[in-house]
């Protein structure tokens, strides 16, 4: 922080402003030149006014810079050369200090201008030759990202295909086990049908044996009856005609044969109808089972297709979400960096403005000091001109 001080000391003297201050001079006036100490760039500048001692002379220049000397003319005449020389030295010292202050002010202005030039925006550089490289790198990054996403998608598709094949294998294995179970069930049904057929065949064999047994008994009865008929004595009796045994036996044989044939046909018809009924039931159940299996297979395939499509969509969604998150993170970091740069530049701009305001205030203060010094120099000049006129009048009166 640049500090300026204006110090004034005197034993019995006072300086006033232009609006009505007073200046006192006395015999043996002693002046001390004002001193200016300036640091680098105008910092730490200290201005102290001249010191003079007066005992009995006073003058006022409240409005018209008029001055009255009350000291004895003899004392002034005796110290005329010394006083004038002292005043001239003090005036020269004031002028030198003013020039030094102006030089310091000029240096300060140059430094302020240099500082503004350094802090201001420099000449714009041509970065157009970097744009192609940046665009190529961005294209490569984008291509690598797309390739990575494609590879990830292929991996997911391969995983889904493997899961699909595993599911299909498990499904086919389950179907194979189901078919084997159905085959085992049909084998049990076939065994039951075989047992039923064997039972029916045994029944037919029993009926055939029974028919053979009946035929045998019938033949034995016929043989017995024939033997009985052959051993009888022919006795002619005048009676009613007897029954024809051969005809009776023939009728019985025909009846038994008809009954046996009817039983055989009934058994064959029952066996055939039962077999056909069982075959129809087996065919109906088999067809229904095949339809149910085909329907279940179609539903499973549809479910697998939907699951594969769902997994593909979920994988694509996850990949897109990852890409979106990566893009948001990258552009968020870039935005934060740009925002930090903007904040830093705004802070620097605020510092520059504050420093510029401070430099302007210091400049105004220096200009005020310069104007006051110029006013004091003008006052001294008017006083010196008044003293020279007075001394000239005194010298002329003495000569006369």
Swiss-Prot record:
The modification Phosphothreonine is found at residue 323. Keywords: Coiled coil, Intermediate filament, Keratin, Methylation, Phosphoprotein. Residues 80-115 are annotated as: Coil 1A. Belongs to the intermediate filament family. Residues 388-400 are annotated as: Rod-like helical tail. GO terms for cellular component: intermediate filament. Residues 244-390 are annotated as: Necessary for interaction with PNN. Residues 116-133 are annotated as: Linker 1. GO terms for biological process: epithelial cell differentiation; intermediate filament organization. The record marks 267, 327 as: Stutter. This is Keratin, type I cytoskeletal 19. InterPro entries: IF_conserved, IF_rod_dom, Keratin_I. Residues 80-391 form the IF rod domain. One of its GO terms (molecular function) is structural molecule activity. The modification Phosphoserine is found at residues 14, 22, 35, 40, 57, 72, 395. The modification Omega-N-methylarginine is found at residues 7, 24, 32, 43, 51. Residues 249-387 are annotated as: Coil 2. The gene is KRT19. It comes from Pongo abelii (Sumatran orangutan). This keratin differs from all other IF proteins in lacking the C-terminal tail domain. The modification Asymmetric dimethylarginine is found at residue 24. Residues 226-248 are annotated as: Linker 12. Pfam families: Filament. The modification Phosphotyrosine is found at residue 391. Involved in the organization of myofibers. Together with KRT8, helps to link the contractile apparatus to dystrophin at the costameres of striated muscle. Residues 1-79 are annotated as: Head. There are two types of cytoskeletal and microfibrillar keratin: I (acidic; 40-55 kDa) and II (neutral to basic; 56-70 kDa). SUPFAM superfamilies: Intermediate filament protein, coiled coil region, Prefoldin.
